[in-house]
Amino acid sequence: MNISKFFLIFIPLVLFKYPANNELINYNVILKYDVKDLFKRVLQEQNEDIKDDNDENDEGDEEDEYYSYLKNRGTNEFDKVKYKYAEYVRFSIFKSKNIYTHIFNELLVFLGAQYGTEEEIVVHVKLIDILSLLFTHYKDNLSKFGHILNSFQDRSKLMNSVENEFMNEFINERDNYIYDVKNAYNKSDNNDDEWIETVLNKKNMLYDKFLKEWRIDGSNFYSIHNKKKTYLPKKVFQNKQNYIPDFENMEHVDLVCKPISDSAIDEKSAEKYEDKELNINEQNEQSNSKKEQTGNDNVSETKMHKEESSDSSNKTDESNVCKSENKYIKKTNNNKKIKEERHGFIYKMRNDFFLSDASLNVISLINSITSNEENKIVKKLYTGLKKLKITTFDNLIRYTNIIGIFFSYDIFDELYLQIKLIKEYFGLIPRNNDELSIVSKSKNVSKIKVYGKYNITDDEMFVPPVCLSAYCKLRSVWMQNRDFNFKIEKYSSNSINFMTLGDIGRGFKKENSYDEEQMLKLIGFNELKSTSNAMKDWHASNNADFVINLGDNVPEVDELDYLKNFEWHKIMRELFTFRKQDEDEEKNDADSYSITKDNIQEFYKEVEKQMNNTNTDDKNQHNDISTTPINNYTDGNEGNNNSENNNGFREYINDNTKDYNIYKNETTEKEETYDSIPFFSIFGEKDYFYFPSEQIQEHYAKRIPGYFFPNNYYRINYDFVYNNKEKNGVQEKFKASFIFIDTWSLMIGFPIIRNYRSFREQFNWINKALLESAKESDWIFVVGHHPFISSGRRSDNYSFEELSFHNIIRNFFFYYNIDGYFSAHDNLMEYLNFGPLNLFVNGSSSRVLFDKSTILGRGYFGKMVGSIYPVTCYLLTTIHSALRPKGCDISKYSKWSNKYDIGFSAHKLSKDELVTEFINSRSGKPVSQKIVIKNKKDKRRKFYDLDGYTNDKIKQFENKIYEFSSKNPNFIKYKIEEFKENDKKLNIIMNNLKSEEEKDAFRSLMFLNNLIFGISSHISNISFDQLKLMCYLANKYRTFFNKKLIKFLGEELKIAVQKMEVKTTNETPHNSNEILNTNENESIQPNDPTMKVEQIMELIDTLGYKPDEFLEKYDAMTQEEKDALKEKLGNDVSLEDYLSKVKMYIHKKKLSAEELKEYEENEENIKIAEVPDESKEDDNTNSQPEDTIDQENKDDINDIINAPNEVHKNYKELVEKEKKLTENEHALLMLSSLKTYDEMKYSLNILSKKEVIKEEAHPYGLYYIEKHKTFFQVSLELCPDIKRIISNLGKVGTKLAFYDYINNLYNKIMDLKNSIDKIAIF
């Protein structure tokens, strides 16, 4: 360790700490002043909380500590109340205004430290304000931004920024849970609850207003009452003359006077009328300032009118006839000057547009970019940042948490979704009637199903009315579609045939000419097309029923510019549409799927023609805007909208009297009818970087035949029927469930806020889906993107020992005994066995091993590199900067793997087995042997047949008993003789007991003595007094009772005593030990600890004997000698009590160390059990006089107790062997003996064992997460793959892909702005 390094850190920190904090506090006040409008309501609540704290000082230290903790955490508005109802984000700044303090902090960061929390300035703003700040003031710098890091320590700063957002979410979850629990416990009214109710009421009102105007089908929004042209945006220039006269204060004007430009007034009146239907979004606050200025002018002029009218006396001076005209002309000129100073424009939308109630609104963001006057909050925030000299995007990244915000919130997905929805609604996406000629188009005609209000549950947060974004509104439809049933009936095959593949996004590349394609094919660089063609060939010969896509469906960022001309759904239609075949079709139909030179050239000619037509239409349309009348353009726009969904709803939109469940055509078919086989899909982590909602949206748009992705997690149930013609129509039936999960969400991947809050809803759904499938299905398969384990390069990123994700998945997999788990992510093909789990990894549809490499994972280069794996995994890490030495060790669980071929897996599922083969995409031939796994339905029997499952377990248990008894006959004989001897002695003891209560308690002990299972069920109804007496008798005659029974009774008695203490404490303030203490003067119990052994030994010494000799002499004493001894002891204590103490002393000396320890543990039970019954009167509590007890019977009992066990003498070896038995072996010994000795007791044990098995197999799943309790299930750290992605972002001096995504988002927003500009009304 370098001591000088720590010295450099510590000494300056001490010297500069006070001035640094002082400077920070001063500037923090300045920054708050700059954004005082934002904090106005916050400061008011803080002052109210201070008053409340002064009034509640008497409530206790615990409450004061809790509220002070909440107060110290930050602003009450954003931390104390439930954050999920607020629309604000936490924007943190880590930079001091003082130059010396800043240099000192930079030195600490360079030495490896992080920016301290005392340097943090927190501002709570809306997310759209952050984006406006970025795209308005830092966009030019962002587009030229080449790298982020000036030092390797800044890389740690980048990681820390994201981790802070993750931890903030964890802390919010925890604190809100504590806050709810305290409120529920205290049952106190809280102002925050009123605030929450107010916010929810407002959101409910907005949502109800939305439902009155709009309906959703999961893909688009449809207006009920208005046509599309009603919602066309209005373009308002900032410098446009827009003055409207004040008619109320206008003086009477002589009609002879020349009026003010009538046409201008009419136009402005029309604009005023339209302004009633349109509204400016939140960020256009310049209009408010304009109104204030105009209002002030009107007020002053009104006063002038009144003064002039009071002085005038109905004069008709010609100079004053046009006075009002001159005045209004002057005001109009002044208004022009104000307008001329404002450059830019804004777009106004109707206040009932489907995005008007969204906090993050892309139209508002466009207005912030195009308008000269920006949001006041953004302007003041930027002013504060400039004072801190944060003027470049590099500074913004290094000294704020803006990257953490991008990782935490779904900015990309929401804005891309809004852009697409707006473009599709207004028909701004050009389409051809025949988009792709190669792919057979879907012939089925189905209805559009639209949805109304969605009923939110406690676990759901990203649905209305809590959330009003476009994503949340669409998700309210998606959440209703999570379970689907399909039926397959065959007569030529007894199996369901399906294929799986993963990581298809890496294969989406720019198309080339036919000759170039042939050249790439020669070197193997046509991976995805090869996989697609091989799958279609397999489908043609085996008639596949469906395909499973395992995630990572989007291309690299450098391909996005090219792919935006095609749209994602068109490429999916080309490559992954598999025509549905009938069983009667011939198997040689594979030729219909082959791609020839002619149809490839024809396809690209169509694409090129389409792109050219699009560019031409855009130019013509842009040129026609200024010359074409608005009405004609609007009609033309509607006529050119060729969207399938919009055409289907055209009749519905125009005629508002019809129901909104409108069919596309009068003749319809069932929704379940497909011309293409289903193509089921899920998300990978790369999909969350770009636009994940588009993939779900395309399911409802139905533009990709067979494409199936209704929600980010869902379940598919297949009912299969095989009609065997050879066996006269005998049917073979089975049911298979495929559960598709979002593994990235379970890992709390980015966007962190969305996935963290939706974690528990998916967790509970998985538990429910698995439970239902275990009851109903013969097969259960789980489908997810990330592997449980693998031997690939990323294996240590997802090691099952590290992540909470794998703990959760492992618990589900083992508990429900699933039949298989399909995954991808690692670019290889592999089959693994992890205990009883069957794991399939298939992520090599387009790359091998190195997914990001341009050469090493592609073509025959990848085949060569992968063939010598894992040697290359180590060697190439020193050559290629993108590689990491991860997963280089071969997994010991791998049964088969292929790391050098691209391909997919083919499966045939029958009633009893699943047969799997991995197929090489280039050759179309299997590269693995047939992998056969058997059905595990019998292991899931406890879920669908609990009684049958229990009976099977009992049969297995009885077989073990039989095996044990057959192997140990002498052991069984010994135990039976011990039972007989003990029962004989116990019967004698019971007959000599004093009272009926003791006899009843002793009978109960004899009944429970040889019970091994379910003892608690037999003593649940026993009273406390009887339990206490049973415990006393069991300890007194402990040599004849089962040790477990004595221990169990002692524990139950302790629990009963604790309950009694709680009850008495609540009623009266008694001492907690009062129930155990008795009056020593009333009675001295035998075995009382106050009777010390030393006193007994002194007494024996006075007699001149040793303890052993004393017992022998006592047996030989006459009655007179015993009476004399009793007189010497005194009448208060019986002689038998002293004798028992002596015997106990001798017995302890003979015990081993372990036996002595066990004996001492039961001393406390003896003390508790010997407590006299206080409910009886004092005269009944004392024992009967000694002279009234039959002395002969007492002597017999003592003889029985002290007599050595004859059976133990005869079987010494077996006694020692019994002590070494395990718990299970001892139970087998007891039951084997009871089966012969006492069949009734044996049957009772078997029945109790059944109940134990049922309780252990109770089919209620693992556990359910309570409200706001997710932090108990998730990891405290980011998942390793998030860290890997962030580490890849943190390379010094390189262009980072993440910032290309931000630039691409800005370009998309500007593209939408240009498209809106074509249809906007001036």
Curated annotation (Swiss-Prot):
Biased composition regions of type Low complexity, renumbered to the chain: 631-646
Domain of life: Eukaryota
Cofactor(s) it depends on: Mn(2+)
Interaction with phosphorylated eIF2alpha as annotated region, ranges: 1-535
EC class: hydrolase
Reaction(s) this enzyme catalyzes, per UniProt: O-phospho-L-seryl-[protein] + H2O = L-seryl-[protein] + phosphate
Region Disordered, residue ranges: 267-326, 613-646, 1066-1087, 1170-1196
One Gene Ontology molecular-function label: metal ion binding
Keywords: Hydrolase, Manganese, Metal-binding, Signal
Enzyme Commission (EC) number: 3.1.3.16
Cofactor stoichiometry and binding remark: Has weak activity in the presence of Mg(2+).
Phenotypic consequence of gene deletion: Conditional knockout during the mosquito midgut stage causes no defect in the parasite development with normal production of sporozoites. In sporozoites, phosphorylation of eIF2alpha is enhanced. No defect in host hepatocyte infection, however, sporozoite development in the liver is impaired causing a reduction in the number of exo-erythrocytic forms (EEFs) produced.
Gene Ontology BP annotations: peptidyl-serine dephosphorylation
Ranges of compositional bias, category Basic and acidic residues: 267-279, 288-326
Residues in the signal sequence: 1-22
InterPro entries per record: Metallo-depent_PP-like, Metallophosphoesterase_PAP
Keyword Manganese among record annotations: yes
Function text: Protein phosphatase which dephosphorylates 'Ser-59' of translation factor eIF2alpha during the liver stage, thus enabling protein translation.
Protein name: Serine/threonine-protein phosphatase UIS2
Organism field: Plasmodium berghei (strain Anka)
